Amino acid sequence: NWYKPEIAANVKREERELFSIQSIHRHVYAPMLNTQAGIISNYDHLFKRYAPIARWDWRLLAAQCYQESCFDPKAYSWAGAKGLMQIMPETAKHLRLAESDVYEPELNIYAAARYINELNTRFMDIRNPEERKFFILASYNGGFFHIRDAMALAKKNGKNPYKWIHVAEYVLKLSTPEYYNDPVVKYGYMRGSETANYVSAIYSRWQKYRGTRNTATITPTDDIPTIYEPHKASKKHRFKLKNVKDN
C-alpha cells in the first residue's frame, strides 16, 4: 500500500509552510464546510454530478479541488491557471471551455472531469483502477509525458512501472541531471517534489473526507489547517497535451 501514516505528517508540514502571508493572494475557505452534516463545500452537488464522468469518488474530486484552489472559484495562478480546478488556457481550449466561462464553477468542474476521464483512458495500461488514480493525479499536476518518463525509468531500473510507490521514486529523481538526461527520458526535467507532494496531499485529504462524511469524529482542524491558500503553480504547461517536450 503506497499510502502510509507518515505521509499525513508530511502533508501537514507542507500545508503549514504554505499557510503564510506570502502565499495568500485570494479568498480562502475551510477544507470542510460542515463536518457534522458531512458537507465538504458549496460545490458538493457539482462534484457529485460530474464525478461519474471522471470515474471517481466525488470526494476525491473535492479533495483535488481544494488542493488546486481552496474552493475559490476566482482563484488564478501566475502561470494562467484559473478557477476551481485551475484549468490552464491551453487545456481550456482543448476542452472547448470558453475563456468567458473558465471561472464558472460548474463548467470548470465539468471540464476538469472530462480531462481526468481523458487521462484515465490514456493510462488504461495500468489495469488496477485504484492504482491508476495516483498516475492521473500526478499527470494533472506534472504532465502526462513526464509521468511516462518516470514509468520508463522505473522499468529500466527493475521496478514495477505500474505501481505508484515505485514510479513516485523516479518522479522525484526527474529533477536531477543524472535522471532527466537518461536516454529513456524524452521530456526532460520536472519538478518532481511538487507533483509527489500534490498526490500525497490529495490522497490524504480524500481519506479524511471519506472518514468525516456524516460523522462528527474528525474536525476540519485535525492534521489540516482550517484555511490556507493553494500555492502557485510552478509549471506553465502542466496540462500540455501536445507530443512535445514540456517547459
Per-segment meaning from a language model:
Residues 1-19, 41, 196-199, 203-210:
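Extended ligand-binding regions for polar small-molecule ligands
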Residues 131-208:
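Catalytic and substrate-binding regions of cell-wall glycan-acting enzymes that process beta-1,4-linked
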Residues 30-37, 47-50, 72-75, 94-105, ...:
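Second-shell loop/turn segments in exported
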Residues 22-71, 106-109, 123-127, 215, ...:
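Export/targeting segments at the very N-terminus of extracytoplasmic proteins
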Residues 23-29, 69-78, 94, 119-122, ...:
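Secretory-pathway/luminal and periplasmic proteins that interact with or process carbohydrate-rich
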Residues 74-100, 107-118, 176-177, 202:
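Substrate-binding/active-site groove segments that recognize
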Residues 194-247:
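Low-complexity, Gly/Ser/Thr/Pro-rich intrinsically disordered linker/tail segments
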Residues 57-63, 82, 130-138:
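Alpha-helical scaffolds flanking conserved acidic
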